[in-house]
Curated annotation (Swiss-Prot):
Lineage per the UniProt record: Eukaryota, Metazoa, Chordata, Craniata, Vertebrata
Zinc finger (PHD-type): 1676-1726
Compositionally biased residues, Polar residues: 35-59, 379-391, 399-420, 725-734, 1345-1359
Modification sites for Phosphothreonine: 507, 548
InterPro entries named in the record: AT_hook_DNA-bd_motif, BAZ2A/B_Bromo, Bromodomain, Bromodomain-like_sf, Bromodomain_CS, DDT_dom, DNA-bd_dom_sf, Methyl_CpG_DNA-bd
Positions carrying Phosphoserine: 509, 613, 1051, 1184, 1397, 1559, 1747, 1770, 1783, 1785
Species of origin: Homo sapiens
Name this polypeptide is given: Bromodomain adjacent to zinc finger domain protein 2A
Residue ranges of the region described as Disordered: 1-59, 362-434, 648-792, 1178-1220, 1283-1318, 1330-1412, 1734-1755, 1769-1789
Length: 1905
C-alpha cells in the first residue's frame, strides 16, 4: 500500500480488445495520486505521446488522440529554452506495449530499460508508464478505452479532451500569467517542413554512432523540425517521400512547394519577433521555493507491426496491455530527460509510419505570422485544430468520436531558441540505412534544424527518428544568464554495428546488439551541448497557433463549404462542424480532410486553413428546430450566429463517475483555477544531492528534519544553477538515464521472450493433448468397427452398399429437382403448351424488316407530324399506301416520293448536315439550299446519308440508281433513318419535353389524389371496423402494386427519376390534407369523398396513359420463339414480330457450347462423388438388415421418405449440401444445346414427328405422375405436395412423353427392369463426363462401372412437343416404359458391371414415395434441357396480329412459367391486361389489315429489278431535255442557225448501261480545271444521250438570255482560243476565236461531265432552266384576259403583235382556231384610230360587251393565226412532251378541250370580274395574319383566284356551283366590312356587275341565285 501511495502515475492497462469490437473497455483499478499538487497522467490509447506532465506547476493534461504527432510535455520554467541533456524524451513508436514492473518491488529491471546504463529513470520519483497507441480502426472508441485521471485522481474510462481554455476552466486556482521565469514560448519557421512519406522503407540491421558535430558545423544545414506545446517538445518524423514527390515538401505561408533531395539543405527563416500569437499572456510568480523540479517520463517504444494499407491509424498499432505494476522500476535515481535517439530499423522489421496515403505524419510548426505547413494538414491521419482556447476538440470528440491532439504553442517574439539538427559526419549514406538523428533545441537566435535523411533502396521511407531535448524548467535560473548553445550529434549512416536498432527497438532484430558505443556517443554529445547551456531574457508565454477566420475562409473561396450545425444536447447547446469538398464529399473530422487533401493535392488549400471549432464565425450556421414537419435544420441569420456561439461556449465535459471514484489525497498546496502546476527541480541536482531528496519525497509523511533536508537540497541546487555548475550534473543525469532505459528495455525484452516461450509451450502441450485424445478416439472407433465387422455376416456389407446407393439416389434426385426449378431457356423446356395460332397481317407483302420500318414511320408521323407541318388526316400515308409506294405500284410511288422530299427537307433544316459537311456544295450551291423535287431528291439524299456515315454500299447504289429503283426494304430503311434523325431535332425534343411536363403534372395530381384517397379509406376502415382491402376493388388492389403503373410510365428512366424527385411533395402535403379529411363528420360523407376522389383518380390515370402512349411503342416481351410483342400508340391490336435475321446459326451455338458443357459436367461430377463418400461414411451405422425384394424397409418413416418429402426441418438440412452440387455453369448450360443430343435429334427427325403408338396404361400413369411433379415445380415450394395435383401439360398428355423408338429395344429381364436403378444412375453420372464431340468420336476413357448411352437411347429419350388429347388415368399401377427398357441394353457389353442391388427402386413404394422410373424420367428431362430445340422456320419471319381479346387470354394460359422469356412476357400481359384488351378493340381503317389477294405485289417483289426502274428514270430525263430544247427554240432564245436534233427518246435501240461509280468523279468534287478525258458516253444509253444533248443545248443558248446563277454579269470574262485549220486551206493555219464564260458555267460543265445518275442530270438541268431568262423572249406571250402564260397549246397569238389570248378566255368562246388572221383587241382599237386598216363595222371590245354580239374576223389578207406551243416551265407542271410529237412550226391546229358551255360562260364572267377596277380586294385570299379576326368571323373564305383554280381543274360540275362561290365572295365582304368602307363599296359594285353579266349570259334561263 505504501508503494501504491507513492505511485503517482499508477494505472492499470486495459486488456486487449479488438479494435473494431465497439465494446467499452472496463475501467481499471489503478488510481492516480498527486505529488506536490500536480497530477501526472498518461492516457492509455491514442497515438500521441502527450501526457500529464508537471511543468512549473502547469498540468498539461492532454486528451487521447490518434494523431501521428509524438508530443511530449516538458515545460520550461525559464524565459529561454533551457535544454538539459538529461531532460528529454525517448519517443520510440510502432512497438507493442509491454508489461511494467511494480515500482515498489525489487524485481529485475525490464530488458528494454536495462539496455540503458543506469537502469530506469523514474519520473517525479515514479516511472511513468508508456502509452499504447490505439488500433488503426479504434478511432471511435478511444475515449472510452483510455485511462486518465483528473483533479481528484479518480480514474475514468473516458478520455478527457481539452485545450487551454478547458484547462483554465478546470483549475480555478491556477492562472497563466507570465512570470519572470515563466515557461518559454516557442516559435517556428514559416519555411517548408519535411513531411512523412506514405510508403515503407527497410532499414539496415546495424549502424554506428558517429562522433558529435560541433554546433557551428551543424548550423550549416537547417530545417524546421519540432516545437513544444506549452513547453512540450513535439517530435516529428522527418521523412522524404520518394514515390510521391508532390507530397515530399510543401510550401508554407504562400511559398512555392518544393521537393527537397535527401542531402539538400533546407533553410529556415527566423520568425518575426514582433508578432505574437498569444491571446492572453500572463506572468508567473518569481517565488520558486515550492516549485517542484521539472520531471519527465521516459516514453517506452512500441512494437512494430506490419503496415496495413487501409488502416485508419497512423502507425497501425494494436491495443495491448499497458505496463503493469510488476514491471515498474525502483525509484532510486533521479529522472533525466534524454534525447530522442531512435536508431534505424533493420531489414527484418521494416515498418511504416503511414499505413496508406492518408496516414501521414510530419512535424508541425506554428508560426506567429503564417499558418503551419501542408505537412501538418495533408500528411496526418488525425491532425490539429488550431483554435485559440476553443473547445473544438471536445466538441468533435463528443460528436464524432475521434480525438485530435492539442494545438501547438507558439513562441514569443522576444524568445530566442534554436532547434538544430546536425547531420551525420559522413555524407555517404547506405541505401538501406537511415541515420538516427538527434534533435537538440538550443536558445539561439532562430530555430535551425539540419536534417539529413538517407534514401532507401526499396519503396519505403525510413523514419528519421529524432531525439528532442525538451526545454527544461528554468524557474531556478537567474533572470540574467549567458546563452549556451545546445547541440546534438547525428549518428552517421556508416556507424558500426554496435548502434543496433535493438537498442531502441528490441524486437527489430533477434540478435543481441551492443549499445555501449551508442551510449558513449550520446553522452559525448550531451557533454558538448551541456557546456554552454544558459538561460537568457524573460518573455511572454505564447499560446498555441490558431487559425484565423481569414485563413478558414480560404477554402471557401476554392469551392469548399463549411457548415456548423447546432443542436440542443442534454444539458447544453452542442455544435458540430462539417466541411464539404468541391466534389460534394462531406467531412466531419480532420482525418477525412487530411485524406482528401492528400489524395487531391491542392497547393492553395492546406491543413491550417481548416478549423472544426463551432465557435469560428465562418460558413453557414444551421440550428435544429422543431417545425410542423418535424425536426429540421434551419439556417441562422447573421444576427443569430453570435448568440449561438455564446450558447455553445461554456464549461463542457462529462461529469465524473462518482460511484467508481476513489478518495484522493488533497494536495498540500492548492493552486488556483488556470494556474499552471509547479515544476519540480530535482532534475537539476546531481546524483549525490538528488538521491536523498528523492527518497524523502517518496515517503508518505515528511518530518521536520526531512523537510529541512529537502529545502537544503533545493537551495544548494539553485546556487549551482546560478553559478552555472549544473551543466555537468545534467550531462551525468542524461548518461545515467540512457543506461537505465537501455537496461529496462533489455529486461522487458527478456520478459516478453520468456512469456512468449511459455505461451508457445502451453500451446504445444494443448495440441499434443488434443492429438492424443483424437488418436484414442480413432482407435476406439476402429476397434468398434472391427468388432462390428467381425460380428456381422457378409450380407451386412451388401445392405450397407444398398443403403449408400439409395442415399446417393436421393441426393441425385434432389439435385435434379432443384435444377428443374430454375428458370430455363424456353426452347430447352419440353413440356410446353402450344401457343395460339395468331393470324398474320392480312395484306402484308413487304419483308419483316421493311414492315417494321413502316410502322415506325407511320407512328412517328402520327405523333409528331403536326410539329413538322404534316396534316395527320391527309399527309400521313397509311400502311397500305406506304407498302404500294415502296413496291412502285400505282400512284402511291408519288406519295412516297413526296413524303421523302418533305422528310428530307425537315432533316436538312434541323438537325441539318454535320459541322464538317456544312460547306458541301453542288454546282456552286449549298446542298441545303437546293430546291428539292422528286427528280433530284435522290442525289441530295445520297449526300445526306454519306454525311451521317450510312453504309457505303447504299450510297454507292444511289450514285448510279435513283431512290425509287432501290429495293423496298432499302427504301423503308432510308425513310426510317430520316425519322430517327428527326427525333433529335429541336422541334421534336421540345414536343417531347412538353409531353413529359404534362405527364409530370398528371402524375403529381394523381399521387395527391391517391394519397388522400388512401387516408380517407384508412379513416373509414377505422370507423367501420372493416379492413382496407375489403373496401378496395380488385382494380385498386392491382393499382396499388408498383407494377400497375408501368404502362402509364413507360417513358423510361428519366421519368422514374422524376417520380423520385416529386414523390416527397405529395407526402408532405398529404399530412395536411389527411388532417382535413379525417375531420369528416359522418361515414356517408367519407364515402362520398372516396367516390369523388376515385373518379378523379381514374381521370388522371387515363390522361397519364394517353400522354405516355404518345411517346413510344411498348415492348411486352418475347415468347419461346423469340418473337417480340408490340403495342403501338395509334394502330389497333398487338403486333408480333418474328426474329428474322436475329437468330444465331445452330452450328455457332454448338461450337460455343462445347467448352461450357464440359466445364459444367466436370464441375458436377466431383461434387457427386464427394457426396457419395460422405454418405458412405455417415450412414454405415444406420444400415438396417437386408430385406426381401418387394418388402417395405424396416426403417423409420422419416428415413424412408425421400429428401423432398421429409419434414421442412430435415428438408432444409438436406438442401444445404445439395446447394454445393449446383455449379454456376449449370445455370447457363440449359440455354445451350448439347451437340451429341442435337445430332441424334436430327438423325431421328422422322421418328420425332410421328404421333406415336397406342398408349398403354402404364404410360398414362407415368404421364400423370410427371404432370403432378411439373405442377409442383410451377405452383409451390413445399416438398410434401409432390403428387397432390395433376395438371396436364402438352408434354404430359398421352403419347407425347414416351414415343415409340424407331427400333424395338431388346426385351429386358423383369428383375433388372423393375428393381435396379443403378444403370440409370450410372448413365446420369456418365452423361456429365461425356465429351461434347460428334457421335462417331469415341468417348474418353472413364471408370469401368460407367457405361455410355447409345445414340438410339438418346434419341428415343427425347420427348415430343406436340399437343394431343389427354387421357387421365388413376396413378396406381406403373409398368416399364421404353425409357426404362433401355437400361439393360446400356448395360450390355459393359466389362466392369456394377453388382446388382438386392433391393429395387423400380416398383411403387409405399408411404407416398414416387417410383424410381419417375426420377429416371426426371434425369432424362434434366439432360434434355441441356439441348435447345431449334426455332421452327415458320416462326422466324413475318408479322402476326392479335385482334381478339380471347386470343390474349389463351396466350396467358399457354405461356410456360419456367421459361426465361415467357415468364416475363406473362407478367407484362397479365399486368396490362385491361389496357391490352382496349387496344385490341380499337377500330382499324388501314387497308393493309383488310384480307385480300395481292398476287401482283408478290410478283413485283419476286421480279424486282433495279435496272428496269433506273432505265425508266433515265428515259424520263432524256425526254425532259428534249422538251427543254423545244421550249428554247419556240422562245427564240437559241443562237441563230441552231436547230435541235431529232428526238432520241423514241428510238428502239436504247438500252440501260450502268457507269461504274468513282469517288473522284463525284459531282461534289471541288476540283477546278480538272484535266483528263471525260467519261465515255454511249449513244444507246438514255442517260448519256441526255447529258450530251443538255451540254449542246447550253452552248447554243444565246448568252444575252442567260442570268444568274450561271451567268452573273459581274463574273463574265472573255477568253480566247486558237483553232487550227487543215494544212491545205488557203487561209492561215490557226484561227483565233473569243468567247465569254463565267466560273459557274465552267463548274456546271464539269459537273455535267461527271453525272452518272438521273438525279445528278436533273440538278444540272434545273439550274440551267432557272438560268434562262424566259421573260426576255420575244415570243413570251400572256393571255390578255387571265394574264397567265400557261396552257400554251390553247394560247392564240395575234397576227398584228405578240399578244395573245386563250381560246377559252376569248368572248365569245372559240371552238377552234379560226382560219386566217386574228387580231387582238389592242390591234383592233389601233385600227379604228387609223393605225391599221380595218373593215367597216368591226366593233370595239366595249361595244361587244354591251351588245353581246360575237366578233367577226376578216380573212381578207393572207396572214395566218399563230398558236404558241410551249413546253412546261417546271418539271412538275404539265406533261414533259407532246403526245403527237413536237414540230418547230408556229401554227398547229389542236383539238379543243370539251368544255361545258355553261362553264365556259363562267370562265368569261370570272375573267371580266378579275379585270374590273373594283376587283382588287377579291383577287387573292385574305391573309389572316394581316387581317386579325377574319378567320373567326368568316368560316368559309372565298376569292377569285381560288375560284379560277377550281374552275381550271374541273372542280365545278355546274354553273350553279360557280355562282354560289361568286355570291359567297360578296356575302363575306358584306359580313366583315362596313358598307361605307372602300372594300364594302367595292363589294357592292362587283355584286351588281356579276348579277348583270350573269343575266346577259343566261337570258331566257332561270338563274339560281
Amino acid at each position: 500500500m505504501e508503494m501504491e501511495a507513492n505511485d503517482h502515475f499508477n494505472f492499470t492497462g486495459l486488456p486487449p480488445a479488438p479494435a473494431a469490437s465497439g465494446l467499452k473497455p472496463s475501467p481499471s483499478s489503478g488510481e492516480g495520486l498527486y505529488t506536490n499538487g500536480s497530477p501526472m497522467n498518461f492516457p492509455q490509447q491514442g497515438k500521441s505521446l502527450n501526457g500529464d506532465v508537471n511543468v512549473n506547476g502547469l498540468s498539461t493534461v492532454s486528451h487521447t488522440t490518434t494523431s501521428g504527432i509524438l508530443n511530449s510535455a516538458p515545460h520550461s520554467s525559464s524565459t529561454s529554452h533551457l535544454h538539459h541533456p538529461s531532460v528529454a524524451y525517448d519517443c520510440l513508436w510502432n512497438y507493442s506495449q509491454y508489461p511494467s514492473a511494480n515500482p515498489g518491488s525489487n524485481l529485475k529491471d525490464p530488458p528494454l530499460l536495462s539496455q540503458f546504463s543506469g537502469g530506469q529513470y523514474p519520473l517525479n520519483g515514479i516511472l511513468g508508464g508508456s502509452r499504447q497507441p490505439s488500433s488503426p480502426s479504434h478511432n471511435t472508441n478511444l475515449r472510452a478505452g483510455s485511462q486518465e485521471f483528473w483533479a481528484n485522481g479518480t480514474q475514468s474510462p473516458m478520455g478527457l479532451n481539452f485545450d487551454s481554455q478547458e484547462l483554465y476552466d478546470s483549475f480555478p486556482d491556477q492562472n497563466f500569467e507570465v512570470m519572470p521565469n515563466g515557461p518559454p514560448s516557442f516559435f517556428t519557421s514559416p519555411q517548408t517542413s519535411p513531411m512523412l512519406g506514405s510508403s515503407i522503407q527497410t532499414f539496415a540491421p546495424s549502424q554506428e554512432v558517429g562522433s558529435g558535430i560541433h554546433p557551428d558545423e551543424a548550423a550549416e544545414k537547417e530545417m524546421t523540425s519540432v516545437v513544444a506545446e506549452n513547453g512540450t517538445g513535439l517530435v516529428g518524423s522527418l521523412e522524404l517521400e520518394e514515390e510521391q514527390p508532390e507530397l515530399k515538401m510543401c510550401g508554407y505561408n504562400g511559398s512555392v512547394p518544393s521537393v527537397e533531395s535527401l542531402h539538400q539543405e533546407v533553410s529556415v527563416l527566423v520568425p518575426d519577433p514582433t508578432v505574437s500569437c498569444l491571446d492572453d499572456p500572463s506572468h508567473l510568480p518569481d517565488q520558486l521555493e515550492d516549485t517542484p523540479i521539472l520531471s519527465e517520463d521516459s516514453l517506452e517504444p512500441f512494437n512494430s507491426l506490419a503496415p496495413e494499407p487501409v488502416s485508419g491509424g497512423l502507425y497501425g498499432i494494436d491495443d495491448t496491455e499497458l505496463m503493469g505494476a510488476e514491471d515498474k522500476l525502483p525509484l532510486e535515481d533521479s529522472p533525466v530527460i534524454s534525447a530522442l535517439d531512435c536508431p534505424s530499423l533493420n531489414n527484418a522489421t521494416a515498418f511504416s509510419l503511414l499505413a496508406d496515403d492518408s496516414q501521414t505524419s510530419t512535424s508541425i510548426f506554428a508560426s506567429p505570422t503564417s499558418p503551419p505547413v501542408l505537412g501538418e494538414s495533408v500528411l496526418q491521419d488525425n491532425s490539429f485544430d488550431l483554435n485559440n482556447g476553443s473547445d473544438a476538440e471536445q466538441e468533435e470528440m463528443e460528436t464524432q468520436s475521434s480525438d485530435f491532439p492539442p494545438s501547438l504553442t507558439q513562441p514569443a517574439p522576444d524568445q530566442s531558441s534554436t532547434i538544430q539538427l546536425h547531420p551525420a559526419t559522413s555524407p555517404a549514406v547506405s541505401p538501406t540505412t537511415s541515420p538516427a538523428v538527434s534533435l537538440v533545441v538550443s536558445p539561439a537566435a532562430s530555430p535551425e534544424i539540419s536534417p539529413e535523411v538517407c534514401p532507401a533502396a526499396s519503396t519505403v521511407v525510413s523514419p528519421a527518428v529524432f531525439s528532442v531535448v525538451s526545454p527544461a524548467s528554468s524557474a531556478v535560473l537567474p533572470a540574467v544568464s549567458l546563452e549556451v548553445p545546445l547541440t546534438a550529434s547525428v549518428t552517421s549512416p556508416k556507424a558500426s554495428p554496435v548502434t543496433s536498432p535493438a537498442a531502441a527497438f528490441p524486437t527489430a532484430s533477434p540478435a543481441n546488439k551492443d549499445v555501449s558505443s551508442f551510449l558513449e556517443t550520446t553522452a559525448d554529445v550531451e557533454e558538448i551541448t551541456g557546456e554552454g547551456l544558459t538561460a537568457s531574457g524573460s518573455g511572454d508565454v505564447m499560446r498555441r497557433r490558431i487559425a484565423t477566420p481569414e485563413e478558414v475562409r480560404l477554402p471557401l473561396q476554392h469551392g469548399w463549404r463549411r457548415e456548423v450545425r447546432i443542436k440542443k444536447g442534454s444539458h447544453r447547446w452542442q455544435g458540430e462542424t462539417w466541411y464539404y469538398g468541391p466534389c460534394g464529399k462531406r467531412m466531419k473530422q480532420f482525418p477525412e480532410v487530411i485524406k482528401y487533401l492528400s489524395r487531391n493535392v491542392v497547393h492553395s488549400v492546406r491543413r491550417e486553413h481548416f478549423s472544426f471549432s463551432p465557435r469560428m464565425p465562418v460558413g453557414d450556421f444551421f440550428e435544429e428546430r422543431d417545425t410542423p414537419e418535424g425536426l429540421q435544420w434551419v439556417q441562422l441569420s447573421a444576427e443569430e450566429i453570435p448568440s449561438r456561439i455564446q450558447a455553445i461556449t461554456g464549461k463542457r465535459g462529462r461529469p465524473r463517475n462518482t460511484e467508481k471514484a476513489k478518495t484522493k489525497e488533497v494536495p498540500k498546496v492548492k493552486r488556483g483555477r488556470g494556474r499552471p502546476p509547479k515544476v519540480k527541480i530535482t532534475e537539476l541536482l546531481n546524483k549525490t544531492d538528488n538521491r536523498p531528496l528523492k527518497k524523502l519525497e517518496a515517503q508518505e509523511t515528511l518530518n521536520e528534519e526531512d523537510k529541512a533536508k529537502i529545502a537544503k537540497s533545493k537551495k544548494k541546487m539553485r546556487q549551482k544553477v546560478q553559478r552555472g555548475e549544473c551543466q555537468t550534473t545534467i550531462q551525468g543525469q542524461a548518461r545515467n538515464k540512457r543506461k537505465q532505459e537501455t537496461k529496462s528495455l533489455k529486461q522487458k525484452e527478456a520478459k516478453k521472450k520468456s512469456k512468449a516461450e511459455k505461451e508457445k509451450g502451453k500451446t504445444k502441450q494443448e495440441k499434443l493433448k488434443e492429438k492424443v485424445k483424437r488418436e484414442k478416439k480413432e482407435k476406439v472407433k476402429m476397434k468398434e468397427k472391427e468388432e462390428v465387422t467381425k460380428a456381422k455376416p457378409a450380407c451386412k456389407a451388401d445392405k450397407t452398399l444398398a443403403t449408400q446407393r439409395r442415399l446417393e439416389e436421393r441426393q441425385r434426385q434432389q439435385m435434379i429437382l432443384e435444377e428443374m426449378k430454375k428458370p430455363t431457356e424456353d426452347m430447352c423446356l419440353t413440356d410446353h403448351q402450344p401457343l395460339p395460332d395468331f393470324s398474320r397481317v392480312p395484306g402484308l407483302t413487304l419483308p419483316s424488316g421493311a414492315f417494321s420500318d413502316c410502322l415506325t414511320i407511320v407512328e412517328f408521323l402520327h405523333s409528331f407530324g403536326k410539329v413538322l407541318g404534316f396534316d395527320p388526316a391527309k399527309d400521313v400515308p397509311s400502311l397500305g399506301v406506304l407498302q404500294e409506294g415502296l413496291l412502285c405500284q400505282g400512284d402511291s410511288l408519288g406519295e412516297v416520293q413526296d413524303l421523302l422530299v418533305r422528310l428530307l427537307k425537315a432533316a436538312l433544316h434541323d438537325p441539318g448536315f454535320p459541322s464538317y459537311c456544312q460547306s458541301l456544295k453542288i454546282l456552286g450551291e449549298k446542298v441545303s439550299e437546293i430546291p428539292l423535287t422528286r427528280d433530284n431528291v435522290s442525289e441530295i439524299l445520297r449526300c445526306f446519308l454519306m454525311a451521317y456515315g450510312v453504309e457505303p454500299a447504299l450510297c454507292d447504289r444511289l450514285r448510279t440508281q435513283p431512290f425509287q429503283a432501290q429495293p423496298p426494304q432499302q427504301k423503308a430503311a432510308v425513310l426510317a433513318f430520316l425519322v430517327h434523325e428527326l427525333n433529335g431535332s429541336t422541334l421534336i425534343i421540345n414536343e417531347i419535353d412538353k409531353t413529359l411536363e404534362s405527364m409530370s403534372s398528371y402524375r403529381k395530381n394523381k399521387w395527391i389524389v391517391e394519397g388522400r384517397l388512401r387516408r380517407l379509406k384508412t379513416v373509414l376502415a377505422k370507423r367501420t371496423g372493416r379492413s382496407e382491402v375489403e373496401m378496395e376493388g380488385p382494380e385498386e388492389c392491382l393499382g396499388r402494386r408498383r407494377s400497375s403503373r408501368i404502362m402509364e410510365e413507360t417513358s423510361g428512366m428519366e421519368e422514374e427519376e422524376e417520380e423520385e424527385s416529386i414523390a416527397a411533395v405529395p407526402g408532405r402535403r398529404g399530412r395536411r390534407d389527411g388532417e382535413v379529411d379525417a375531420t369528416a363528420s359522418s361515414i356517408p360523407e367519407l364515402e362520398r369523398q372516396i367516390e369523388k376522389l376515385s373518379k378523379r383518380q381514374l381521370f388522371f390515370r387515363k390522361k397519364l396513359l394517353h400522354s405516355s402512349q404518345m411517346l413510344r411503342a411498348v415492348s411486352l416481351g418475347q415468347d419461346r420463339y423469340r418473337r417480340r410483342y408490340w403495342v403501338l400508340p395509334y394502330l389497333a391490336g398487338i403486333f408480333v414480330e418474328g426474329t428474322e435475321g436475329n437468330l444465331v446459326p445452330e452450328e455457332v451455338i454448338k461450337k460455343e457450347t462445347d467448352s461450357l458443357k464440359v466445364a459444367a459436367h466436370a464441375s458436377l461430377n466431383p461434387a457427386l462423388f464427394s457426396m457419395k463418400m460422405e454418405l458412405a461414411g455417415s450412414n454405415t451405422t444406420a444400415s438396417s438388415p437386408a430385406r426381401a425384394r418387394g418388402r417395405p424397409r424396416k426403417t423409420k418413416p422419416g428415413s424412408m421418405q425421400p429428401r423432398h418429402l421429409k419434414s421442412p426441418v430435415r428438408g432444409q438440412d438436406s438442401e444445404q449440401p445439395q446447394a454445393q452440387l449446383q455449379p454456376e455453369a449449370q445455370l447457363h448450360a440449359p440455354a445451350q444445346p448439347q451437340p451429341q443430343l442435337q445430332l441424334q435429334l436430327q438423325s431421328h427427325k422422322g421418328f420425332l414427328e410421328q404421333e406415336g403408338s397406342p398408349l398403354s396404361l402404364g404410360q398414362s400413369q407415368h404421364d400423370l405422375s410427371q404432370s403432378a411433379f411439373l405442377s409442383w415445380l410451377s405452383q409451390t415450394q413445399s416438398h410434401s405436395s409432390l403428387l397432390s395435383s395433376s395438371v396436364l401439360t402438352p408434354d404430359s398428355s398421352p403419347g407425347k412423353l414416351d414415343p415409340a423408338p424407331s427400333q424395338p429395344p431388346e426385351e429386358p429381364e423383369p428383375d433388372e427392369a423393375e428393381s435396379s436403378p443403378d444403370p440409370q444412375a450410372l448413365w446420369f453420372n456418365i452423361s456429365a463426363q461425356m465429351p461434347c464431340n460428334a457421335a462417331p468420336t469415341p468417348p474418353p476413357a472413364v471408370s469401368e462401372d460407367q457405361p455410355t448411352p447409345s445414340p438410339q437411347q438418346l434419341a428415343s429419350s427425347k420427348p415430343m412437343n406436340r399437343p394431343s388429347a389427354a387421357n387421365p388415368c388413376s396413378p396406381v399401377q406403373f409398368s416399364s416404359t421404353p425409357l426404362a427398357g433401355l437400361a439393360p441394353k446400356r448395360r450390355a457389353g459393359d466389362p466392369g458391371e456394377m453388382p446388382q442391388s438386392p433391393t429395387g427402386l423400380g416398383q411403387p413404394k409405399r408411404r407416398g414415395r414416387p417410383p424410381s422410373k419417375f426420377f429416371k424420367q426426371m434425369e432424362q428431362r434434366y439432360l434434355t434441357q441441356l439441348t435447345a430445340q431449334p426455332v421452327p422456320p415458320e416462326m422466324c419471319s413475318g408479322w402476326w396480329w392479335i385482334r381478339d381479346p380471347e386470343m390474349l387470354d389463351a396466350m396467358l394460359k399457354a405461356l410456360h412459367p419456367r421459361g426465361i422469356r415467357e415468364k416475363a412476357l406473362h407478367k407484362h400481359l397479365n399486368k396490362h391486361r385491361d389496357f391490352l384488351q382496349e387496344v385490341c378493340l380499337r377500330p382499324s381503317a388501314d387497308p393493309i389489315f383488310e384480307p385480300r389477294q395481292l398476287p401482283a405485289f408478290q410478283e413485283g417483289i419476286m421480279s424486282w429489278s433495279p435496272k428496269e426502274k433506273t432505265y425508266e428514270t433515265d428515259l424520263a430525263v432524256l425526254q425532259w431535255v428534249e422538251e427543254l430544247e423545244q421550249r428554247v427554240i419556240m422562245s427564240d432564245l437559241q443562237i441563230r442557225g441552231w436547230t435541235c436534233p431529232s428526238p432520241d427518246s423514241t428510238r428502239e435501240d436504247l438500252a440501260y448501261c450502268e457507269h461504274l461509280s468513282d469517288s473522284q468523279e463525284d459531282i461534289t468534287w471541288r476540283g477546278r480545271g480538272r484535266e483528263g478525258l471525260a467519261p465515255q458516253r454511249k449513244t444507246t444509253n438514255p442517260l448519256d444521250l441526255a447529258v450530251m444533248r443538255l451540254a449542246a443545248l447550253e452552248q447554243n443558248v444565246e448568252r444575252r438570255y442567260l442570268r444568274e446563277p450561271l451567268w452573273p454579269t459581274h463574273e463574265v470574262v472573255l477568253e480566247k482560243a486558237l483553232l487550227s485549220t487543215p494544212n491545205g486551206a488557203p487561209e492561215g493555219t490557226t484561227t483565233e476565236i473569243s468567247y465569254e464564260i463565267t466560273p459557274r458555267i465552267r463548274v456546271w460543265r464539269q459537273t455535267l461531265e461527271r453525272c452518272r445518275s438521273a438525279a445528278q442530270v436533273c440538278l444540272c438541268l434545273g439550274q440551267l432552266e432557272r438560268s434562262i431568262a424566259w421573260e426576255k423572249s420575244v415570243n413570251k406571250v400572256t393571255c390578255l384576259v387571265c394574264r397567265k402564260g400557261d396552257n400554251d397549246e390553247f394560247l392564240l397569238l395575234c397576227d398584228g403583235c405578240d399578244r395573245g389570248c386563250h381560246i377559252y378566255c376569248h368572248r365569245p368562246k372559240m371552238e377552234a382556231v379560226p382560219e386566217g388572221d386574228w387580231f387582238c383587241t389592242v390591234c383592233l382599237a389601233q385600227q379604228v384610230e387609223g393605225e391599221f386598216t380595218q373593215k367597216p363595222g368591226f366593233p370595239k371590245r366595249g361595244q361587244k360587251r354591251k351588245s353581246g354580239y360575237s366578233l367577226n374576223f376578216s380573212e381578207g389578207d393572207g396572214r395566218r393565226r399563230r398558236v404558241l406551243l410551249r413546253g412546261r416551265e417546271s418539271p412538275a407542271a404539265g406533261p414533259r412532251y407532246s403526245e403527237e410529237g413536237l414540230s418547230p412550226s408556229k401554227r398547229r391546229r389542236l383539238s379543243m378541250r370539251n368544255h361545258h358551255s355553261d362553264l365556259t360562260f363562267c370562265e368569261i364572267i370570272l375573267m371580266e370580274m378579275e379585270s374590273h377596277d373594283a376587283a382588287w380586294p377579291f383577287l387573292e385570299p385574305v391573309n389572316p395574319r394581316l387581317v386579325s379576326g377574319y378567320r373567326r368571323i368568316i368560316k368559309n373564305p372565298m376569292d377569285f383566284s381560288t375560284m379560277r383554280e377550281r374552275l381550271l381543274r374541273g372542280g365545278y360540275t355546274s354553273s350553279e356551283e360557280f355562282a354560289a362561290d361568286a355570291l359567297l365572295v360578296f356575302d363575306n365582304c358584306q359580313t366583315f366590312n362596313e358598307d361605307d368602307s372602300e372594300v364594302g363599296k367595292a363589294g357592292h359594285i362587283m355584286r351588281r356587275f356579276f348579277e348583270s353579266r350573269w343575266e346577259e349570259f343566261y337570258q331566257g334561263k332561270q338563274a339560281n341565285l
